[in-house]
């Protein structure tokens, strides 16, 4: 009984169209940032190292190298703070979680491009 009500409420809130992407893909996430009284979009571009598919609670982690320092950010897929997600490049990987990239740097951290 309660489960159906929760599923219905979650389905109503999951209206945002999210492009299909997988770990290894390079994505650009446009995030809404509020500075004082104005709001702007900030782009966060990096490699998806993990994805969690849980309906409304879905999330994904993006890793990028900024000024020689690795930066990871986890985004809730259906968050109102995430404006848009665009896939820049498809990566060819054999694992679902790419946490091993944290220990790699430079050319060793490159991911082959998927040829479709």
From Swiss-Prot:
Please identify the protein, giving its name as recorded: Large ribosomal subunit protein bL19
Sorted keywords for this record are: Ribonucleoprotein, Ribosomal protein
Q: Which family does it belong to?
A: Belongs to the bacterial ribosomal protein bL19 family.
Species the sequence originates in = Stutzerimonas stutzeri (strain A1501) (Pseudomonas stutzeri)
* GO MF, any single term: structural constituent of ribosome
Q: Which SUPFAM superfamilies match?
A: Translation proteins SH3-like domain (SSF50104)
Write out the GO cellular component annotations. cytosolic large ribosomal subunit
Concerning Gene3D superfamilies, the annotation shows:
2.30.30.790
């Amino acid at each position: 009984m309660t489960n159906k009500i929760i599923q219905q409420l979650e389905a109503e809130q999951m209206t945002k169209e999210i492009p299909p992407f997988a770990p290894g893909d390079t994505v650009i996430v446009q995030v809404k940032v509020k500075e004082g009284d104005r709001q702007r979009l900030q782009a966060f571009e990096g490699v998806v190292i993990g994805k969690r598919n849980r309906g409304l609670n879905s999330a994904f982690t993006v890793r990028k190298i900024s000024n020689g320092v690795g930066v990871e950010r986890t985004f809730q897929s259906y968050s109102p703070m995430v404006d848009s997600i665009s896939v820049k490049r498809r990566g060819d990987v054999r694992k679902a979680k790419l946490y091993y990239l944290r220990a790699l740097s430079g050319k060793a951290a490159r991911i082959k491009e998927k040829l479709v």
